[in-house]
Amino acid sequence: MKISGFSFGRNTSKLYYPIKESILSILPICDEFIFVLGKGDDDDNTLEILESIDSPKLKIIHTEWDTEKYPNGTENAHQTDIAISHCTGDWLFYVQADEVVHEKYLDLIKSRCQELLTNDAVEGLLFKYRHFFGDYN
């Protein structure tokens, strides 16, 4: 069984997304992690953050965003599709740039993926999650 993690983003450091924490939260159970990186602004250092992960599992795919061709947020779906097209796993785990998976669930996630791998009635797994809101004030 092979698990592919994936995500996408651009200007994630400028927007204060915890991209490194997000990837590292699921990386232990992934055989590969695909990150589709859109060309960001000159002062964005998302690539450096990704490279600091220093894992052979992490594959960075560089892209250009075309918001004229994909307007009103549909570029996000387009970038997601690009990431999916590079995944080679039996299971694909989508973690967005502002999401993390608690480490106490990693073994359970992996074991359920293994258990359900050949069950054709299962198309995906659903997770309960919590939202945290806050600011710097």
List where the protein language model places each region.
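Active-site-proximal specificity loops/subdomain of glycosyltransferases
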Residues: 3-6, 10, 18-21, 38-94
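Short acidic, S/G/P-rich loop/turn micro-motifs used as interaction or catalytic elements
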Residues: 11-14, 99-102, 132
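Gly/Ala-rich phosphate-binding loop of Rossmann-like dinucleotide-binding domains
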Residues: 27
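Receiver (REC) domain switch/active-site residues of two-component response regulators
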Residues: 31
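Ligand-binding pocket scaffold of soluble enzyme catalytic domains
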Residues: 34-36
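Acidic donor-binding/catalytic loop of UDP-sugar-dependent glycosyltransferases
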Residues: 45, 95-112
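Basic phosphate/pyrophosphate-binding loop/patch that engages nucleotide-derived ligands
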Residues: 113-119
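Short beta-strand-to-loop element that shapes/binds the nucleotide-sugar donor at the catalytic cleft/hinge
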Residues: 121-137
